[in-house]
Amino acid sequence: ASRIPTVEAQFFGELATLLAWADEVARLEVMANADTPHDAARARAYGAMGIGLCRTERMFNDSRRLPIVQDMILADTPDERRAALEKLLPIQRADFKGIFQAMAGLPVTVRLLDPPMHEFLPTASQLEFEIGQLRNLQRAARSVAELPETLKLLDPELPRDYVESLGKLQASLALYRESRSADAALERREALLRKVHVLSEVNPMLGHRGVRLGLSFPEIYEMQIRAILEAAAECTKEGIVVHPEI
């Protein structure tokens, strides 16, 4: 089917004038949901009077940050968890600063981490599939290493070009095995799968989340509150009026 070219929606002068008239008599203030500085800037441009809900878990779902969040979840001790949180702190601080800058002078309501931990992990079925694939890869690498001797059972005088080709393949596989990249990937996925089983809940919507999560792992909320306050302090130093609400 054909597609009609689209353009980004824009506020034209006439609409801005109409909305300004509405603002003069409005008794309600409309705020926005925004979880990133980009979304906050768009909301401000569209006339939002602040951010009514900033969901911090949306910041964690970024593909560059998710591995750090997963390290935090896999941590067995508070110290290990804090090490991962220290990596997240500057990222969260930068996010909040960008949001406060976009919403200068307006309130920003921040919700600390709410969803259960397992939402940041792959599903059990996905992990089981990936573990199976990695184990197949390991078996295949071992089989190729044994291939020359196996082929000699069929033909003790292997053709020279067979021997050379297999030698090159074996050399490549030897480097791969020495790097242990597959072993590390397998170990991580097995650890994630164990954690998925541990965190599994019958009804996650009413389970280990929100304030319950904060009571179990107070260091998570400590990091987030620190990031909010440090971002607010940096903005204040730059003359930006901020109204963070947690």
Task: List the model feature ranges, each with a label.
Residues 8-246:
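Conserved alpha/beta-domain cores
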